[in-house]
């Protein structure tokens, strides 16, 4: 009773009745939907596949929390919106999280604590981190029932601001911050993460991009030796070293390319025609396309360059731009015309920014506050594992339901943040979910879809 009085707080009265509240409801959970993520993990086995790669030197007779248990709890918490390990000060007692991790909600042992999580985030060696990162590629390849004929991979980096003296932190003048610039690679067709790699906060060099592509494509070729692979990225990745490697290894590419006076001179006749036609037609915007063969001084050969040329009224008085805006891409693709390559193929890479936003903003993968670069890479791996769980959960939503096309934050709100009371008896466990849940039908259908097919 003393504890209840200490925890109670008042709320506005309703119809002259006093309202008080206290966190004394007992074995309740505000995240009962975590059971859906647990079903997704049982199918994908992300935690188990990662755990076997981390050496555990503890005495098996005295282990309460296996490595798989620790990683699974961490990924489930990230998926439910708890990216901070300190949240386990309370979550370790949550009955829904305990049940999702394979423990009895009342009589079972509590989950691991924050210090245990931190120790295992810092435990993997460099070789283990490399193997764990390669496993992300293996998980993606395993998501296909059979090798695809072709895949398009989107590659991009994102700023991850740091506030300490972490390893690999670097000053970036463009962002005016000390930061990391981790590289994200996604499957353009499915939105699935292929790999996420922590790196210093500076623009990647051509040699760095070449090495990354060499290791990534080499790993993919182990699974799919005959699949046609294409790489799509902005001008950061359109370096001669990377393009030469792609050409020598049967990989197609389409990259952004910075403009210069040589390229502008090559497309000037087309640009002038578009500028004049826009003025004569008094159109607000007129767009056209051109292409040429071009080789920068540092390039070993000429390559196909496509130009998107846009004349608009807003640029008409701009003396520097001469009433025109030109964007270039360089590509090894030869079959399509210039308009299709730019409008359909290259511009579709904008979706990668939305995928990075889900990874970074909605799963808080920028919580890279460990001093060690290896520990921060381990965090990116765990956040990518949580991404897979939410991706599988979204795929299990019926096609007629608009939730199948929503972002992770909405799915978390509608399907994971559901109140429930978990009751453990001698022979069974019952989860009593909120009766007024708006997504009760969807929750049931998703749970059935994610059920394992075996006995």
Indicate where each model-derived feature is located.
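Acidic/histidine-rich, metal-coordinating catalytic segments
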Residues: 156, 226-238
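Dynamic "connector" segments at or just before major functional cores
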Residues: 1-177, 181-204, 210-223, 418-455
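Short amphipathic alpha-helical "interface-anchor" segments enriched in bulky aromatics
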Residues: 40, 88, 341-378, 382, ...
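An anionic, glycine-rich sequence signature occurring as long contiguous blocks
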Residues: 4-22, 252-361, 449-455
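Short acidic (Asp/Glu) and glycine-rich catalytic loops that position anionic groups and cofactors
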Residues: 13-19, 50-54, 95-99, 245, ...
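C-terminal structured "cap/appendage" subdomains that terminate the fold
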Residues: 384, 389-433
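Short, surface-exposed basic-aromatic patches at helix termini and helix-loop junctions that form
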Residues: 243-252
């Amino acid at each position: 009773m003393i504890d209840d009085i200490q925890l109670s707080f008042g709320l506005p009265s309703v119809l002259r009745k006093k309202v008080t509240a206290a966190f004394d409801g007992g074995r309740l959970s505000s995240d009962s939907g975590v059971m859906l993520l647990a079903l997704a993990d049982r199918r994908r086995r992300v935690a188990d596949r990662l755990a076997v790669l981390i050496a555990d030197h503890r005495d098996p007779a005295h282990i309460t929390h296996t490595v798989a248990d620790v990683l699974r709890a961490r990924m489930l918490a990230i998926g439910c919106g708890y990216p901070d390990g300190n949240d386990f000060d309370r979550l370790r007692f949550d009955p829904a999280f305990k049940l999702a991790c394979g423990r009895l909600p009342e009589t079972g042992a509590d989950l691991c604590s924050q210090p245990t999580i931190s120790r295992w985030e810092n435990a993997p060696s460099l070789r283990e981190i490399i193997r764990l990162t390669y496993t992300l590629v293996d998980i993606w390849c395993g998501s296909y029932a059979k090798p695809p004929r072709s895949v398009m991979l989107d590659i991009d980096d994102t700023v991850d601001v740091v506030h300490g003296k972490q390893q690999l932190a670097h000053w970036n003048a463009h962002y005016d911050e000390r930061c990391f610039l981790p590289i994200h690679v996604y499957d353009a067709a499915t939105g699935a993460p292929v790999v996420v790699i922590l790196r210093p906060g500076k623009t990647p060099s051509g040699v760095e991009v070449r090495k990354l592509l060499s290791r990534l494509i080499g790993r993919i070729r182990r699974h799919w030796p005959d699949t046609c692979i294409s790489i799509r990225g902005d001008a950061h990745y359109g370096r001669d070293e990377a393009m030469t490697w792609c050409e020598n290894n049967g990989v197609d590419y389409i990259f952004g390319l910075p403009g210069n006076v040589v390229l502008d001179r090559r497309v000037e006749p087309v640009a002038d025609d578009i500028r004049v036609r826009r003025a004569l037609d008094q159109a607000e915007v007129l767009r056209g396309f051109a292409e040429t063969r071009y080789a920068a001084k540092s390039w070993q050969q000429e390559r196909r360059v496509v130009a998107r040329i846009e004349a608009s009224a807003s640029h008409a008085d701009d003396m520097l731009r001469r009433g025109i805006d030109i964007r270039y891409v360089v590509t090894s693709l030869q079959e399509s015309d210039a308009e299709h390559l730019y409008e359909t193929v290259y511009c579709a890479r904008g979706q990668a920014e939305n995928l990075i936003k889900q990874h970074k903003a909605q799963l808080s993968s920028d919580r890279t506050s460990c001093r060690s670069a290896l520990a921060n890479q381990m965090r990116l791996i765990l956040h990518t594992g949580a991404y897979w769980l939410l991706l599988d959960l979204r795929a299990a939503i019926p096609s007629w339901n608009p939730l199948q096309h929503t972002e992770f934050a909405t799915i978390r709100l509608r399907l994971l943040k559901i109140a429930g009371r978990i009751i453990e008896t001698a022979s069974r466990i019952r989860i009593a979910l909120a009766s007024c849940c708006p997504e009760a039908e969807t929750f049931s259908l998703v749970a059935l879809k994610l059920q394992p097919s075996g006995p």
